Amino acid sequence: MDKNMKILVVDDFSTMRRIVRNLLVELGFTNTLIQEADDGNNALTMLRSQPFDLVVTDWNMPNMTGIDLLRAIRAEPSLKGLPVLMVTAENNRDQIIAAAQAGVNGYVVKPFTAVTLREKLTKIFERIAASGASA
């Protein structure tokens, strides 16, 4: 997995954005440009104006939720292939299914560890590499 990438972390809680950022650095994403947005609307504006390699988003946010952000990403031709990892306190089966149906690449329930984050990211990028090799 390439650890030199541009990641957008989306969460309305600044402490959670900082936790995700610190865990990414702990996992070796030291040459990575990590940017932050506090809701889905701001994230979508950023995604439309500059390229990113990964979005890590919360579900529950004001203005535009993470699931609505995911749906907007999948609806835009220029963004639809962007990997999205949902990091949320939502452990409801229906919401996990809704995220899968909307095209999420991975789902992590808070609280989580660096090991869990690494495993999810590894799986996401392994699947992307495998689908690219077969395309």
What are the language-model segments listed below?
Residues 14-35:
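Two-component/phosphorelay signaling modules centered on CheY-like receiver
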Residues 50-56:
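Active-site beta3 strand of CheY-like receiver
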Residues 61:
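Receiver (REC) domain active-site loop signature in two-component systems and cognate sites
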Residues 68, 91-106:
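Alpha4 helix (beta4-alpha4-beta5 surface) of REC/receiver domains from two-component response regulators
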